[in-house]
Design a protein with these regions (language model features):
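Glycine/tyrosine- and acidic-biased, solvent-exposed loop/turn segments at the edges of beta-strands
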Residues: 17-248
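Bacterial Sec-dependent N-terminal signal peptides
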Residues: 1-23
Length: 248
């Protein structure tokens, strides 16, 4: 009985000692060693990772607030330069997004994935937390949906959108987040619908409307919206009639 009591006390004290080794500070009051955080209400594990005199070290894991405690994100500080590589997961373990954070802002390439898929939905590039370079968005069939050039977080350059079959829908240009220069819009088959020019985000000059590859109307920029409404109504009626004919 005495021997059993001693063993029990040893196990209990060992457990307490192990707990004492978690969430500790160094002599300067900086977090040091293994740290674990918990969800406020459930008290389930929220994260775990290691600090070295106040600095994150290695891989930190973050858990959802369920009994399963699924890993929903990791932050890798292995470079030791203060940066961390973040990977976000859904509750089935599929990647949602991943990329680098430096000084608490996005840096370099970031990837976003289609739901429950390894296929990339969006690729974008950051410099000091701002979008820079070409941002691309993809359909689930892997065809390009959109490509936009950014500089310092603003659209600067080409902006093209495509349908799921890879046909160009819009061919635009931006300067400091405002439409500038020639803009061309297409239908789903690659034929022009209308085109014109922009300046400082506003339509200028004459705008042309097309049917079957030929110009059918040309209007001043200030009359574009009114003409567009009539043009689209005409297109919808023509499309509806075509569909009716196809059902006969």
């Amino acid at each position: 009985m005495k021997k059993f009591l001693i063993q029990t006390l040893f196990v209990f004290s060992s457990a307490l000692f192990a707990q004492d080794k978690i969430n500790q500070f160094d002599e300067k009051g900086l977090r040091h060693g293994v740290w674990k955080g918990y969800h406020d209400e459930s008290k389930r594990p929220r994260y775990e990772g290691t600090f070295e005199h106040g600095k994150e070290k290695g891989v930190f894991k973050y858990f959802d607030d369920t009994k399963a405690g699924t890993v929903i994100a990791t932050r890798d500080f292995s470079k030791g330069d203060g940066s961390c590589y973040i990977v976000v997961f859904d509750q089935k373990g599929n990647k949602v997004s991943e990329g680098l954070v430096v000084n608490k802002v996005y840096e370099g390439e970031w990837k976003y994935y289609h739901k429950e898929s390894k296929d990339i939905m969006t690729i974008e590039f950051y410099k000091a937390g701002k979008l820079n370079g070409t941002r691309k968005v993809y359909y689930k069939n892997k065809n390009l949906a959109e490509e936009v050039v950014y500089k310092d977080g603003l659209k600067n350059g080409i902006c093209k959108t495509y349908n799921e079959n890879g046909k160009l829908i819009e061919d635009l240009n931006f300067v400091n987040d405002k439409l500038e220069g020639k803009a061309v819009y297409y239908d789903g088959t690659g034929s022009k619908l209308y085109e014109g020019n922009n300046k400082g985000g506003a339509k200028v000059g004459n705008w042309k409307f097309y049917e079957n590859g030929k110009v059918v109307k040309e209007v001043k920029a200030e009359k574009f919206s009114k003409e567009l409404a009539k043009y689209e109504e005409k297109r919808m009626k023509a499309l509806a009639n075509t569909q009716k004919e196809g059902k006969k």
